[in-house]
């Protein structure tokens, strides 16, 4: 019973992580509420009944989960959402040992933290933390206190619509005068160049290998 969930492939491409709800009781398929989402790992070629439970939060039945397995295979990042507001909690698990616990990185719903990617223990997010028009923020999971956070790309006069890490660079998609403006930065936040368009328009969906 998969709803409100994408999938995130493991680095070895042998399976993927996803969120699902318990199967409703007989006769309640189209009546029961969406409660108690859980995160599972599905190995390709095996029945869904064999999927491994990765995370659940029964004390918070209204929470939903979006999964991101990092490209280097080291971490599973879970974005926790509640309702429709762009305010998220963030959890992560070190995948080097199956017994490692799920750790709270952001333990409140006060701001947006949209996961972009990672460089080792540094996790990159598009965020409105102290930045109403959004910034790119980096958090070291080994030193997660907010005083150690780094604003990689500060808030600009334009609104940061989306961001991604592609080919070792940050691609920042801004909305300026109802049209797209694309700027490229290195992972330390140094400006590299602006992508010029032949005319007025919009562009989005910048992603690929980090």
Residue ranges of model-derived segments:
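Peripheral, non-catalytic segments that deliver or gate enzyme domains
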Residues: 1-210
């Amino acid at each position: 019973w998969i709803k409100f969930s994408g999938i995130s492939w493991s680095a070895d491409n042998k399976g993927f992580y996803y969120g699902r709800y318990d199967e409703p009781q007989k006769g309640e398929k189209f009546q029961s509420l969406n409660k108690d989402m859980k995160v599972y790992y599905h190995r390709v070629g095996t029945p869904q009944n064999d999927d491994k439970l990765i995370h659940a939060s029964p004390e918070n039945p209204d929470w939903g989960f979006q999964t991101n397995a990092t490209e280097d295979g080291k971490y599973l990042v879970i974005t926790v959402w509640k309702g429709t507001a762009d305010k998220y909690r963030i959890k992560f698990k070190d995948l080097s040992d199956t017994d490692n616990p799920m750790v709270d990185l952001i333990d409140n719903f006060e701001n947006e933290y949209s996961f972009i990617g990672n460089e080792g223990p540094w996790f990159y997010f598009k965020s409105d933390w102290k930045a109403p028009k959004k910034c790119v923020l980096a958090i070291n999971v080994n030193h997660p206190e907010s005083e150690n956070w780094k604003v990689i790309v500060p808030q600009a006069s334009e609104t940061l619509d989306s961001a991604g890490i592609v080919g070792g660079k940050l691609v920042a998609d801004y909305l300026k005068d109802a049209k797209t403006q694309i700027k490229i930065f290195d992972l330390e936040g140094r400006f590299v160049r602006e992508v010029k368009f032949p005319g007025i328009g919009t562009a989005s969906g910048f992603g690929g290998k980090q």
